[in-house]
Every structure is written in C-alpha cells, then in structure tokens.
C-alpha cells in the first residue's frame, strides 16, 4: 500500500489555526507551531473566563447592592434577609440595576426589608 501524505488536510488544519491566530503579536500570528500553542492557550483562557465572568458579575452586583443598602442604613446580608422574609423575589442583577439607576425604588425595597426584619 502506498504512503499517503496528508497535504490538503494538513494545509486546511494549519490555515484554520493561523486564522484563529490573526492579530497576535510577533511570531504568534505567522508561524504554525507557535501560533498553535498560543491558540490552544487562548481557547483555554476563553473557556475558563466564560465561567469566571459569571462570578465576576455576581461580585459586582453584590458590591453595588451593599453600597446602596448601607446608604439606607442596612448591611447587604440584612437587606437580603429582609427581602426574603418579605417574599420579594428580585434577583441581584435587578437589585444592582435599581441601586444604580433608581435609588428611590431601591430605598422603598430597603424600607420594606427593614419593616420585615423588625417583625
């Protein structure tokens, strides 16, 4: 059986990698071996950081809610507990948006939480 060289397949695979490496600095965008290493590393970073982004946004929302809660005389944990006791099902993303864009509505929720904490 004759030897089969993978010409078209190899070329296609290498073109795909170099296309993904577009915009990289130095040899990383032009040389296949270096580009392949960087593309693999970049894809790993992308996979990891798609999960990290969800954690980062949750942290940001909590920081914003805590700052607004303290302006209304509550800590973050007491605000969340009070809202839970009141049966308010507003998620952290919506609360953070209210804290930034509609302080009056957030203050009403904080007052509701205070009232339910004192029961």
UniProtKB/Swiss-Prot annotation:
SUPFAM superfamilies: Ribosomal protein L20. It comes from the Bacteria. The keyword Ribonucleoprotein applies. InterPro entries: Ribosomal_bL20, RIBOSOMAL_L20_CS, Ribosomal_protein_bL20_C. CDD domains: Ribosomal_L20 (cd07026). Keywords: Ribonucleoprotein, Ribosomal protein, RNA-binding, rRNA-binding. Coiled coil: none annotated. GO terms for cellular component: ribonucleoprotein complex; ribosome. One of its GO terms (biological process) is ribosomal large subunit assembly. Belongs to the bacterial ribosomal protein bL20 family. Binds directly to 23S ribosomal RNA and is necessary for the in vitro assembly process of the 50S ribosomal subunit. It is not involved in the protein synthesizing functions of that subunit. This is Large ribosomal subunit protein bL20. The gene is rplT.
